[in-house]
Each structure stands twice: as structure tokens, then as C-alpha cells.
Amino acid sequence: MTAVASPHTPVPPTESFVHVAPAGERPGFDLAYERRGSGEPVVLLHGIGHHWQAWEPVLSILAASCEVIAVDLPGFGASPELPEGVSYELDSVIPLLGDALSALGLQRPHVVGNSLGGLLALELASQGYARSVTALSPAGFWTGAERRYAYAVLLGMRAGAKGIPDALLHRMARSAAGRAALTSTIYARPGRRSPEAVVAETRSMRGATGFAPTLKVGRSPDVIFDRDIPDVPVTIGWGSKDRLLLRRQGTRAKKTIPGARLVSLPGCGHVPMNDDPALVARLVLETVRAV
């Protein structure tokens, strides 16, 4: 039987980087990533302020039957921010991510994303870069009020991450109550997260150079997903306890993409990979096999 990492297993920082060469008017840039397993290629995209380790232990489960590539988006985790003057707008970022897929030797992989990563996954599919999509609480199906609420929460999380001293962070992460105080906005089961993971993701939020430019671009009312993806299998999963992007946004997503499969994730928060990794991995594999 293949060993699978538990939510309590510390995940080491990535040491792999790919240089994405310039393409036409698009600049070159570097991207950090983790690559495991063999089989159908599956790319994992995290949410704003997070890093590739958000996908543990789902990554390890998927790697038992797929080639899994989890990336740190530009300006998040270990990836440097985009070159000066390069916009974080979707029209700019999606072609750059397409270039990154090519640099990783991938042609139309299956793409899985959470939150911001879910929106990026859907955009990649709509532009022909993805073979299938599993989007977990994807951004882009909000009303103006819902978007403003989410951004206020994110700004609060960022301020908290930047303001907490490391000594206090480590002390809080050692207790279930402390981990809940630090992460219950995004996890329904924060006690499952290891102290090491909580410290690492708080530091990731604190140091994310891509956070401010991404949030600035996302304040635009134009940041919505408003078109069908008729030729690509799409699964949309939404946590029943998502406190950041409310469940009714999943209903809008289904109306926008009528052929998508909308699945409720019982007992899961905004980042369900921690709350029920087996369920998330099963959704991904079902979508991969639907092609």
C-alpha cells in the first residue's frame, strides 16, 4: 500500500524552480513547484496568500496514480513576483501560466484550483490550456457586496499575518485553540493542520509579494467568470462551511457553466484540502477520468 501523508505531516519547502522563457512580448519569469508521481498530468493551483503546500495531503494521494505538479503562483510561496511593470490582470496572467505549463513540459494538463486558483483553472480551460478542471470554491462568481466582504476578510488575514511576532505564532500553532484562531477563516477543521503547516502558511501570507497587486486587480467589478466551457469536463466543489466565498456562489457557477458538476463538500471550509483530503482527491480523480 502506498503511504499517504496525513494532515499532521510537516511538508518541506519546495526546492524546484523552472525558468519560463520570454515569449513574444511576454517576459520571462521563474516559478517554484513540486512534482511527484507518474501518469495523467494534474496541475494544482493554490489561492491568494497561500503556497503549494496547501495541497497536502491531497497531492500525495493523487501522486499514487497521476503525475502531479503543484506550483507556487507568481509572488506567492517561493516564487518571485512578476517582473516590474507586468500586470496581475487575468488577461496578462493566463498567457504567462500557459507559458509556464509549456516550460514544465505539459500540454493541456488537468488543472485543479482553489479560490483564486479555481478562477485561474477555469480561465485556463476556457482558453484551451486545460483538459479538465476541478475548481474548489473558485473566485469570480460573487456579487459586488460578496467580493467586498471577501476582500475585507483577506485584508484582515494579511494584517494579522504581518502583525503577529514569530514567537507568538509558534506558541499559538502548538495548540488546537491557537490553530483555530489563526486558520478557522479558511478551514472548518483547523485542528487537523499541523503546527508546522500553520506556521509556514502564516509566513507565506505575510511574505506574499503578489498579494497586494492581485487584490488590487481583483477589486475591479470585471473580475468575474461569465462564460460556459462546453468542451471540457468541469467539477465545482463548494465547502458546506465556506465562510469566505459563500455557498450560493456555487449555484451561480453552475448556471454559468451548465455542464459542470456541482458538488457540495460536507463539513469543509474554504480550503477543503485540509478538511477532507480523501473527498477532494476523489473529486479530482473522477474529473480526470471523465475525459
Could you say what each language-model-derived stretch is?
Residues 106-115:
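Alpha/beta-hydrolase fold nucleophile elbow
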